[in-house]
Amino acid sequence: MFGLRNLRRGLSLCRFYSKPRPTPAPIKQDSQQSSQLPEWQKREKAHRKRYGNWNPTKRLSRAQMQDLRSLKQQMPHMKTIDFANLFKVSPEAIRRILQSKWTPTEEEEARLAARAQSAKNKSAQRRQQQIDNLKQAHSRMQPVTGIVEDARTSAIRPRNPRQRKPRQHQGQKTQQTQHDHDSHQPYVPSVGDVLE
């Protein structure tokens, strides 16, 4: 009755109205501008659209770069994004590493290893210097062995805290002969206080 043709048309209309569509005017202008651009700018634009801006937060070591290249040779079906998730770096960084064909010669490799070792030694020396400075600063400080007292207050305050008189609590009578409370316990009124 309705036919396959009408059913397909209805499905395509449903898909058309269910998805938001971008306005066609900027796309035409963009395509006209991109046709006038040189090839390298088109390629850069396509890379930016695909991967986003290149802002590397983590750098891979040379050994990791070599591992990445060998993995790509062993598994060419893996995509750049998969490698980016594996190494936890941006896909753009992975693309640049895989695109580069530079390999160091033996002399360059020795020079790079020496530079890395000297940087490591400088870092260790800097760390040791900081530790030595902290030890010197700690040794210059003299430990306080007793309570530092001010001459103005030492005459007023008794030296031994146990020789102090017990504090008078709220509701407590000033002359207390029958009830000697421990100075550490708060005063609690009892039946005997009411009877007196």
Curated annotation (Swiss-Prot):
Subcellular location(s) per record: Mitochondrion
Alphabetical GO CC annotations of the entry are:
mitochondrion; nucleus
Kindly indicate whether the keyword Repressor belongs to this entry: no
- Enumerate the InterPro entries for this protein: NGRN/Rrg9 (IPR010487)
State one Pfam family annotation: Neugrin
Q: Where is the composition biased (Basic residues)?
A: 159-170
Keywords in alphabetical order? Mitochondrion, Transit peptide
Q: Where is the transit peptide?
A: 1-22
Positions of region (Disordered): 19-48, 103-196
Renumbered to this chain, the Polar residues biased-composition regions fall at 29-38, 118-133
Its main localization is mitochondrion
Name the family.
Answer: Belongs to the RRG9 family.
PANTHER family cross-referenced by the UniProt entry: NEUGRIN
Functional description taken from the UniProt entry: Required for respiratory activity and maintenance and expression of the mitochondrial genome.
Name-wise, this protein is: Required for respiratory growth protein 9, mitochondrial
Q: What's the gene?
A: RRG9
